[in-house]
Each structure stands twice: as C-alpha cells, then as structure tokens.
Amino acid sequence: MSDKLAARERFLDVFEDLVEELKQILVSYNMPQEAIEWFVRSLNYNTPGGKLNRGLSVVDTFAILNNTTSDKLNDTEYKKVALLGWAIELLQAYFLVADDMMDQSKTRRGQPCWYLVEGVNNIAINDSFMLEGAIYILLKKHFRQDPYYVDLLDLFHEVTFQTELGQLLDLITADEEIVDLDKFSLEKHSFIVIFKTAYYSFYLPVALAMYMSGINDEKDLKQVRDILIPLGEYFQIQDDYLDCFGTPEQIGKIGTDIKDNKCSWVINQALLIATPEQRQLLDNNYGKKDDESEQKCKDLFKQLGIEKIYHDYEESIVAKLRKQIDQIDESRGLKKDVLTAFLGKVYKRSK
C-alpha cells in the first residue's frame, strides 16, 4: 500500500470511531433508534466521500510543525489531530449539503445530492445543521481541558461566518435566472473566493494544527494568513481556469461555470478587455444552458488570449508566494515547509 493510501486509511479509521462516539451521545439522550440511524446515514453519506485534502492537511501540518511525519504519530496524538481534520470535513459536509439545495445541484462526488436521496428532501436542511453541530460536540468531548479550546471554537465560528458571507455574495451576484454581467467584477470575484473558499480550505487546517502545536502568537497566525489567503485565491482562479479550459478527462468533471452564470475569474478577465461587439456576444450567450452558447463564449475566451493571461498570472503569483515563504520568521516554531507543501499541492495541478 502506498504511503498516501495508508495515510488516508488511517484517517478514515478515525472517522468510524467518531461516528460511533456521536451515535453513543444520541443513545445517552435516549434518542429513538430510527433517528440515530438517520443521523449515522447522513454522516456516512455526506462526510467521508471527497478527496479529504482539508482534513489530511491538518495532520500533515501538525507533523511538520512537530518535526515528524504523520505515520510516526502515536495513536493518542494521531486521533486528536485527525479529529480536528474531521471537524473541517464535517464543516465542508454542512456547507455542501446546504449549497447543493441552494444550487439545485443533481450530483455530488459521483452520487445523488443528499436532498435528492429518496425520503430526504427538505430534512436535508436540518441534517446540514446537525453536521455542523457535531463539530462542537466532538470538540467539547476531546479538547475541553486544553488551553487552546476557546481558540478552536473562535476559529471555527469565525471561519464558518466568513464562508457564509462569501456564499451570500456568490448567490446574489450570479443569479442563474437573470444574467447581468454588469454585476460582475474582479473585486467581487476576489471577495467571493477568499471568503467562500480560502479561509476554510487553506487557513483553517493550518491554524488548527498550529494551536494544537502550541504556536499561537498572532504574528505567526498573520504570517500564514498572509500567504494562505492569496494561495487559496490562486487555487480558485486555477479552478475557474480549468473549468473552462480543462478537459473532463483531465479535471474529472464537466465544467459548468459558463452555463451556470458563475462570476468566475475567466469571465471577469474577458469583460476587462472585450470590445463592445465581443461584450454583446457575452451578454447574449453567457449563462445560457445550451452547448452552442457555451461554445461561443469558450471560443471568444480563446480569441481574447485568456490562457496566456492565466499563465502569466500563475507565474507571477507563485514567484511572489515563494518569496514570501522564504522570508518567514521561524523563531517561534512556525515552519516554512508547511507553506511550501501547500504551494506544491496547488502549483501546476491539473484537477
């Protein structure tokens, strides 16, 4: 078994323990069996199915900060840090269950969205709340005695609210029914991706590992924030680029940003340089559900040289981030390797 697969298996084993713990808490409340089974089914359906990047990076970051590798952590230590990883995966599950209902999505991670599973429907709203609630039940059980317990709570509450702000701006900017490209701007795009993605996917995993490692100086949290937030923005810009220019075989999904009227980086770059005629073509075709309109937009993006603009942006942001990482002050226990590892996962990825 490869190291990567072994790390994933060990992480998944902890999830089984957590489901059992949550189940026992419901048993202690004298919850009827059918409700316990429902919650367990929701946990298993919605939480462990993705790539688990966010959760695993808490473990990897903790290991780097403690001069070791994740496979060398003893079981007690491993379970505790993996629990923080699973808390992010529960947060992600909570967002996705709700997000899929808001977007009326059909599938998620290769299976029907939870609200479309037979018999679930609007109960999925309450299920999403329970996935979030599970985070705090688990944190209380495992971290109540730790000096950084309140820091963990603050961090989860703040990042959750930031993500919801990003989601709000996304929803009111990109209405699937009414296409209005005047609503789009690169400033809005930047706010959406930083708040909706960068905080919980990039900053949160590292900040959690730092608190657990006793690295809690605001100077250090700021050092990582100043790198991970732009890195998260770059990650999402890359995602927008791949949605339009990547092939389904390459990215593992069919890009839908154009048809969904998304306020993506690609359309915003096009709007900056389009002639009035080209703008008219975008007004007439962007956000339309048919393949022909989508293709017209894609052809125009190619014609406008968006690919080169992206590659130039990528090289400049990566050079800037590398320089920032080089200048990190490691005197209080922070390690450059943490940030180098994150950058390595994002730079030149193809899916």
From Swiss-Prot:
The keyword RNA-binding does not apply. GO terms for cellular component: cytoplasm; fungal biofilm matrix. Gene3D superfamilies: Farnesyl Diphosphate Synthase. Dimethylallyl diphosphate binds at residues 108, 196-197, 236, 253, 262. It catalyses: isopentenyl diphosphate + dimethylallyl diphosphate = (2E)-geranyl diphosphate + diphosphate; isopentenyl diphosphate + (2E)-geranyl diphosphate = (2E,6E)-farnesyl diphosphate + diphosphate. Pfam families: polyprenyl_synt. Keywords: Lipid biosynthesis, Lipid metabolism, Magnesium, Metal-binding, Steroid biosynthesis, Transferase. Its EC number is 2.5.1.10, 2.5.1.1. Mg(2+) 1 binds at residues 99, 103. This is Farnesyl pyrophosphate synthase. It comes from Candida albicans (strain SC5314 / ATCC MYA-2876). The gene is ERG20.
